[in-house]
Regions:
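Short, flexible segments with low predicted structural confidence
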Residues: 1-3, 33-34
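Short, well-ordered beta-strand segments in beta-rich or mixed alpha/beta enzyme
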Residues: 3-9, 40-68
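Short, surface-exposed ligand-recognition loops at beta-strand->loop->(often short) alpha-helix junctions
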Residues: 10-20
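Non-catalytic surface loops within mature trypsin-like serine protease
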Residues: 11-13, 58, 94-97
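An amphipathic, aromatic/His-enriched active-site/gating alpha helix that lines ligand/cofactor pockets
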Residues: 25-37, 55-91
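Glycine-rich beta-strand-turn "strand-cap" elements at beta-sheet edges
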Residues: 40-50, 76-106
Length: 106
């Protein structure tokens, strides 16, 4: 069953551009890790909560990532604490239903 990991981060006012630039310039080590399906970084339409969504083939794959040297290296240079207004919130969910693929127009 696919596992979706969401990491909610409250970015402080004035730090949004640096935060986004950091994501756009990263190496995306996770993309090559076994079991990862994809990662998305979502910008808030309202408020200050950015959300990083990572989709995994299994919870075990995610746990291998969090215990790996690659994970440690990917998180070695975090933004300064003042870039955030509160601690991040990590949530794990399993997909139990999804819509069929959307029709494409020709």
């Amino acid at each position: 069953m696919v596992l979706v990991v969401s990491n909610r981060m409250s970015v402080a006012k004035g730090w949004e551009e640096d935060f986004e630039r950091g994501w756009n310039q990263r190496k995306w080590t996770v993309a090559q890790f076994p079991g990862v399906i994809r990662t998305e970084v979502l910008r808030p339409v309202r408020g200050d909560h950015y959300v990083v969504m990572t989709y995994w083939k299994s919870k075990e794959d995610f746990e291998r990532w969090t215990g790996s040297q690659a994970h440690i290296e990917a998180h070695a240079n975090p933004p300064p604490k003042e870039a955030f207004t509160s601690p991040n919130k990590l949530e794990l969910h399993e997909i139990i239903a999804e819509s069929p693929p959307m029709a494409t127009s020709t």
